[in-house]
Each structure stands twice: as structure tokens, then as C-alpha cells.
């Protein structure tokens, strides 16, 4: 629908409103269009839930999420246009489409905040009920929206020349082009369908290898063939899509970290430890007997954790000079607004500051009163204080470098670290205080993540001429509905990837027993118990115990578990959840004072050395921490992006055009399709259909595919043909055009 009152828009011009002193939105402030409508809110909620599901899966696998605003914008335009044709109604306005992406984008940020923190409770031996996840997500999400409201004018309006908010600007570009020329969602749907089909064939039917690998070996002086290193790639559509979106530079840093881990650290530890006859803590066996996976789990894991922690804190310190100016600017704006009766234009109306104050107060009361959170006054004060600080930081950082590069985990590590140190200083070192620290971290992490997404949405609204108050209401809807779903998704994925491993610890008696909970292994019924602290060599965790509460089996969580093979011989792929592992390591290590500080400091100084070289340490550190199979596939996606960009004009390689191009839209479809099919396969993994066999076991055709199922080379060729080549062709504009 054309808007006659607007100045002509050059579809090829850069619409970042930084060059002129007076900003002119696409929809004038005096123009009233349909915006906050039930249809827009409902569609935003539905699309938000879809992308929240994919974000949960992606964050659990690799500790990363990507912005959902652009694909949601494209889908909204197409869906509303289709509904308009079949119903004979007027097409949706640009402000309604903006409301859809505003409401829908909240799900991705809530998912990131929750997944980065709360699964750490599983590693410390606790259950993670969906009600706790939902409560923390709702409170943290609402805090993120409320605390961002006083900062909107200072950051989005007053600093529009310095804070570009790239994803928000790109989403506005898509909305405006869709308003003028129409946008087809074929590109997103094509990526979604291809990814879902590929994921089903590879991860469900197992027609060919999902994680092909090559092992480097050499002849040792003893005459034995020993491991020298290995490289593997989890050739999945969602990781390929992530690599394309983040680009070759960041994807290359991630892969460099993986190479450092698998080709330097692991071989070095193996070489220096091969002749040792004593166990080197925190390892549980001789280094000579360990393979690459065991060396990584026992040693490199802590080096990577130290590197990620230090890199996150470094990225946070870099933004320190901007924190004070943003905070003081927000209060100054509110002070200037008091005592004046001048009517503000529609495009500058926020929710009243009184509503913000009441909303924050309600969140504080909920944190103290709700049994699912149940924190004390000191903890609530820490949560609100850290949330306000990092909401400001998050908004500024996303304005400078985008939401995908926002160091949310660094802010959360800082929160958990400082909280744990405060608890240690006042003597709060019991198991319950670890839960308290992680709950505070969860609230702050969700608030910071939501604030970053809120900033991008408000930037989009600022460009297209939306009403901030209505956007903020839409965000409250999106945050709340997504939060209620995410807890159930985490439980489902954890259960589907959980393994039961035979373990025995003589003399250890488990005192915490789940009332009414039981499980059966080989026809024998066991009770379910928990150790929340190491006891007699048995680490904190969930166990199956007999009537005397003696341990028989470890229930290894699907999220961040370490034992992929079940007692039945079934092998599952664990969800690494790297950020949650770091949170558990930090809070448990500080409060129990058992951190392997030597390895942690090696990682920390490694990050510092990388920074001194002028390289951003955070993506390299995350690469050290992640399995190389993950970073290698993202790197391949980045390489495809690089190949595409070599054939594009210079002006189309960066900025809004690059962030909303067909390759990015296709990659968004790859991420959503692969992740949602992964969730579906997780359901099949726990659905018993034939005696004691699951649906996933029934559809597995591994035994019938011969060489295709075992050849790493064939798997790589098929990956290139089925995913990499189509992505390159779409990125070049050879199919599935978005405009």
C-alpha cells in the first residue's frame, strides 16, 4: 500500500538516517496507520515461537543465536499480502509488518538469555523444571524491555549518527522495499524446506555421515600408532547458515580457535603427557590412555573456559566509557521532559516512566515471592542493579556492532563472577547459593539479550515511523509468550539426548531423592536421586539408586553431558551448551574453591595475547571451547559468503544491503528448518513405537546404505552439492530472489 503523504524513497539509497540533522521517518509522525492490531500481535507471536524454537536448539548446540528480525519481516509481508488477496481486505500497513517483527524477534533474545545460563543447573545436579525457566525468562524479559524504555531517546534518537544498529536498519530496509515493490518469502521457504529435508535424511535416516572426520596419526617411539590430531565437521544446515550470516571474518576466527584447540593444545598435552605414570588433575586417568575427546574434556575444556571468560570481560571493559554517558543521558532526558506540556509527536511517545517504575517493582516482587525463583532481597537488588547496567551496555554494543556480536555471555559471566565473589565474601557458599547465583545470572542475561533486540526493533521503528509505545507493548507480548514455551523445549531436548551410564561409587549414599520419580534399566526399577556436591569421587549430578540409596547409574544430561553412549548401546549426540557450562564452572569453582586455576589462567592469558595481536579474542576463545566439528562447518558457511561477495559490487558487501540479501534470507531459512527438524527428531528419540524401540531407531537406515553411510569423503561431497552449492547460487542471485 502506497503512502501518499511520504517523500519519495530511493530504494537504492542508504536509509541510515545519519547524514541529515533532522530525521524524516518513512511514515510521517502526523500520519495514523493501523499498527498495534490483534492480527499483527498474533502473527508476531506465532513467528516468534517458531524462531524461539530454532534459537533454543541452536544456542544449546553452539552457544550462538542470530537475529530473527529480517526473516520475520519477510514472512510477515508475504503472509499478510496472501491473506489480503484471499480475503479481499486491504493489505497490511508497513507499521503492522513492523509490529510483527518487533513482537516476533523477542523470542530469539529470550531463548539466548535462558539457554546461556539456566542449563548450568543440570550440571550441578539439580532438576530444571519448565516453571523455573518460564519465571526467570518472563521476569528477565520484562526487565529488559522496561529498563530500555528510558534509554530509547538517548541511544536511538540523540546518538543516531554514532549508533547505527545494523540489524534494525536492515530490517527497516526490508520493510520499506516490501512496501514499495513487494517482497517474496520464497527464499526463506526454500532454505527452510531444503534444511528440513537434509536434516531428516542425515540426522534422522542416517543415509550418510552427519559428522565426517579425519584422524591424524603417527608412529610413536614405542612402535605404536598414536593420535596426533583430528578434524571433523558437523555438516548441518543450521551451522552452515550461521556461518554465512556471521561472515567469513568471524567464522574464520571461530575456526582458528578450533584449530588451536585440536592441532596445538590437544597434541601438546598428549605429547608431554604420554610418558607420565601419574594422573594429572583435573583428569581422571592417564593422559597416555586418552583420545582427543578425553583430552578436551579433561583439560582443554578448562583452558577454553578461561579464554572465553577473559575475552568476555575484555569485550565488556571496552564498552566501559560508554556506560556512564548512556545512563546519565537517559536520566537527563527524563528530567528535561518533566514540567513541560508540549505535545510530543506520535513517533516520540514512550510508555510513561511511571509504568516503567511500577513494572520494575512488580518484577522485583515476583523474584522474591514466586517459589520458582524465590530469591532474597539482596539477590533481587543485585539482579536489578546488574540488569540496569548491562541493559545499557547491551544496547550500546548492539548499536555499534550488531546483535549477533553482542557479548551477552561476557556480561553474564561478569554478573555470575561478581555475584559469586560477593557470596563468598559473606559466607554464602552452600549448594543453594549456587542456584541463587545462577538465577541472578539468568535474569540479567535474559534482560541484556532482550534489551539488545529491543534496541534493534526500536531502531527499525524509528526509521519507518512506528510508535515506540506500541512497539514496547508488542515486545511485552512477545517476551511473555516465548518465555512460557522455552522451558518445555529445554526439557524435551534434554530428555531426548540424555544417556544412562553404569557407574558405581562404593560407600556413597545419595540423600536427595525425587519423591515419586523412578526409572527402569534392564527390567530393574531404581529411584532417582541427586548429588549437588562431589561426594566420595562421585561428581554432582543425577543418579539412579537402589532402595539403600547406593548409586548404580549416572543419568548424564543431554545438555552438556559427557557420555554419548547409553547403557543399552545407543549413541546420541550431546548438546554442548558451551555458555551454560562456563556459568556452571565459574559459580561452582568459586563457591567451592576448587577451580583448576592453572588451566583457567592459561586460557585467560591466551585471550589476552590474542587481543595484543589486534585480533578480537572472543570468537577465537569460543572456537577453542567449541568442538572443531562445529566451528569447521560455520567456517564453510563463511567461505561461501566470501565467494559470493567476490562477485558483488563493493557497496553491496556491507551495510543494510548485505544484511538483507538473498543469501542471508536463505541462510535464515536453513537455520530455522534445520533447527526445527532437529527438535522434531528429538521428539522421535523419546517416542516409543515398537516395544522398547523409539521412532528414531525405527527410521534409522544406517544398516542398509553400505558405503554411503560410512564414507566421510562421500558425506562431504553430498554436503557441498546439497547445501553449499545452493547457498552460493542463491547468494549470487541465481534463485530464490528476495526482492
Where are these regions (language model features)?
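Alpha-helical multipass membrane-protein architecture
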Residues: 1-739
Amino acid at each position: 500500500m502506497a503512502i501518499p503523504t511520504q517523500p519519495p524513497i530511493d530504494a537504492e539509497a542508504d536509509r541510515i538516517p545519519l547524514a541529515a540533522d533532522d530525521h524524516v521517518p518513512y511514515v510521517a509522525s502526523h500520519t495514523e496507520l493501523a499498527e498495534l492490531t490483534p492480527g499483527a500481535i498474533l502473527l508476531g507471536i506465532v513467528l516468534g515461537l517458531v524462531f524461539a524454537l530454532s534459537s533454543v536448539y541452536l544456542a544449546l548446540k553452539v552457544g550462538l543465536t542470530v537475529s530473527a528480525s529480517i526473516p520475520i519481516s519477510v514472512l510477515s509481508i508475504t503472509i499478510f499480502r496472501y491473506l489480503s488477496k484471499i480475503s479481499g481486505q486491504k493489505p497490511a500497513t508497513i507499521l503492522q509488518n513492523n509490529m510483527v517483527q518487533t513482537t516476533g524477534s523477542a523470542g530469539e533474545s529470550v531463548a539466548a538469555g535462558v539457554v546461556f545460563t539456566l542449563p548450568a543447573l543440570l550440571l550441578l545436579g539439580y532438576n530444571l523444571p519448565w516453571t523455573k525457566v518460564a519465571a526467570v525468562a518472563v521476569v528477565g524479559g520484562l526487565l529488559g524491555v522496561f529498563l530500555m524504555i528510558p534509554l530509547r531517546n538517548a541511544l536511538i534518537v540523540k546518538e543516531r549518527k554514532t549508533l547505527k544498529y545494523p540489524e534494525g536498519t536492515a530490517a527497516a530496509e526490508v520493510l520499506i522495499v516490501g512496501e514499495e515493490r513487494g517482497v517474496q518469502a520464497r527464499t526463506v521457504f526454500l532454505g527452510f524446506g531444503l534444511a528440513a529435508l537434509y536434516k531428516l535424511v542425515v540426522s534422522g535416516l542416517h543415509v550418510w555421515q552427519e559428522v565426517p572426520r579425519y584422524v591424524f596419526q603417527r608412529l610413536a617411539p614405542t612402535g605404536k600408532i598414536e593420535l596426533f590430531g583430528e578434524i571433523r565437521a558437523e555438516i548441518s544446515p543450521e551451522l552452515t547458515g550461521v556461518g554465512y550470516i556471521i561472515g567469513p571474518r568471524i567464522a574464520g576466527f571461530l575456526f582458528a580457535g578450533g584449530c588451536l584447540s585440536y592441532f596445538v593444545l590437544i597434541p601438546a598435552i598428549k605429547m608431554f603427557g604420554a610418558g607420565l605414570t601419574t594422573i594429572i588433575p583435573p583428569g581422571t586417568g592417564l593422559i597416555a590412555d586418552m583420545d582427543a575427546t578425553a583430552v578436551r574434556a579433561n583439560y582443554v575444556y578448562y583452558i577454553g573456559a578461561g579464554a572465553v571468560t577473559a575475552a568476555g570481560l575484555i569485550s565488556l571493559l571496552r564498552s566501559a566509557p560508554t556506560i556512564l554517558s548512556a545512563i546519565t543521558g537517559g536520566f537527563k532526558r527524563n528530567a528535561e521532559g518533566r514540567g513541560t506540556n508540549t505535545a510530543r509527536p506520535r513517533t516520540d511517545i514512550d510508555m510513561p516512566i511511571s509504568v516503567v517504575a511500577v513494572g520494575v517493582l512488580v518484577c522485583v516482587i515476583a523474584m522474591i515471592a514466586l517459589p520458582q525463583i524465590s530469591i532474597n532481597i539482596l539477590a533481587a537488588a543485585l539482579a536489578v542493579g546488574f540488569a540496569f547496567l548491562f541493559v545499557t551496555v547491551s544496547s550500546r554494543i548492539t548499536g555499534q556492532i550488531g546483535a549477533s556480536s553482542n557479548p551477552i555471555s561476557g556480561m553474564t559471566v561478569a554478573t555470575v563472577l561478581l555475584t559469586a565473589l560477593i557470596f563468598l565474601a559473606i559466607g554464602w557458599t552452600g549448594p543453594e547459593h549456587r542456584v541463587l547465583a545462577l538465577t541472578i545470572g539468568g535474569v540479567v542475561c535474559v534482560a541484556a539479550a532482550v534489551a539488545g533486540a529491543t534496541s534493534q526493533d526500536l531502531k527499525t521503528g524509528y526509521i519507518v515511523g512506528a510508535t515506540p509505545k506500541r512497539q514496547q507493548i508488542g515486545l511485552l507480548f512477545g517476551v511473555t509468550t516465548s518465555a512460557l514455551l522455552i522451558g518445555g523445549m529445554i526439557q524435551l531436548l534434554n530428555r531426548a539426548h540424555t544417556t544412562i551410564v553404569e557407574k558405581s561409587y562404593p560407600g556413597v549414599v545419595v540423600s536427595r531423592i525425587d519423591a515419586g520419580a523412578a526409572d527402569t534399566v534392564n527390567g530393574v526399577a531404581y529411584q532417582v536421586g541427586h548429588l549437588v556436591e562431589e561426594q566420595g569421587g562421585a561428581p554432582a549430578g543425577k543418579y539412579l539408586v537402589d532402595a539403600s540409596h547406593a548409586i548404580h547409574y549416572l543419568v548424564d544430561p543431554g545438555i552438556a553431558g559427557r557420555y554419548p553412549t547409553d547403557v543399552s548401546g545407543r549413541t546420541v549426540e550431546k548438546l554442548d551448551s558451551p555458555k551454560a557450562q562456563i556459568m556452571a564452572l565459574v559459580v561452582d569453582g568459586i563457591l567451592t574453591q576448587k577451580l583448576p586455576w592453572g588451566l583457567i589462567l592459561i586460557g585467560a592469558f591466551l585471550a589476552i595475547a590474542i587481543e595484543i595481536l589486534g585480533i578480537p579474542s572472543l570468537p577465537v576463545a569460543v572456537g577453542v571451547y567449541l568442538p572443531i566439528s562445529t566451528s569447521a562447518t560455520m567456517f564453510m558457511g563463511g567461505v561461501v559468503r566470501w565467494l559470493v561477495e567476490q562477485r558483488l559490487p563493493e557497496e553491496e558487501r556491507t551495510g543494510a544491503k548485505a544484511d538483507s540479501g538473498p543469501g542471508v534470507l536463505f541462510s535464515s531459512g536453513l537455520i530455522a528448518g534445520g533447527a526445527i527438524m532437529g527438535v522434531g527428531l528429538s521428539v522421535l528419540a523419546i517416542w516409543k513405537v515398537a516395544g522398547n524401540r523409539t521412532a528414531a531407531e525405527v527410521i534409522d537406515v544406517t544398516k542398509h546404505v553400505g558405503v554411503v553411510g560410512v564414507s566421510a569423503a562421500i558425506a562431504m561431497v553430498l554436503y557441498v552439492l546439497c547445501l553449499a552449492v545452493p547457498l552460493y547460487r542463491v547468494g549470487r542471485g541465481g534463485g530464490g530472489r528476495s526482492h
